[in-house]
């Protein structure tokens, strides 16, 4: 069985949602939660492969309901076998929402914290410098446990 793995995180925040300078901590906490929910905390192969970026956008550049609004968007791009377990989906989404809500001091409404997952096609994942299948990724991750 292939163990689920995680990869790039793109965190997009409207300016002012988090106290200035807390974006890196939010990124780290969201990444750690992802590893935890996939049973990969401490995995030596996965830790260096959790990559990504955060962006802080001006208030007039983020929208909800087609209106300007402060939003937090947590988006993961992962191999097609990640996030397939409903318990992982529910658990991670709840924890990630809590992280942003708490770090905002309770100011960011939970209904303006959005999370989604984008799956890649099997074999179209760049891991260790070349395209790998889900099975090949699973073999590499198993070595890091």
Feature map (PLM): residue ranges:
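A domain-level signal for the structural core that forms small-molecule/cofactor-binding pockets
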Residues: 2-145
């Amino acid at each position: 069985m292939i163990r689920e793995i995680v990869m790039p995180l793109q965190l997009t925040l409207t300016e002012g949602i988090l106290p200035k300078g807390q974006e890196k901590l939010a990124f780290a906490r969201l990444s750690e939660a992802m590893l935890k929910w996939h049973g990969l905390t401490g995995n030596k192969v996965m830790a260096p492969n959790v990559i990504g970026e955060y962006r802080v956008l001006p208030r007039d550049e983020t929208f909800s309901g087609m209106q300007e609004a402060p939003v937090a968007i947590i988006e993961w791009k992962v191999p097609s076998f990640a996030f397939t377990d409903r318990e992982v989906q529910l658990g991670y989404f709840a924890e990630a929402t809590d992280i942003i809500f708490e770090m905002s001091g309770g100011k960011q409404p939970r209904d303006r914290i959005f999370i989604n997952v984008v799956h890649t096609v099997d074999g179209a994942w760049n891991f260790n410098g070349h395209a790998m299948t889900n099975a090949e990724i699973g073999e590499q991750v198993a070595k890091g446990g």
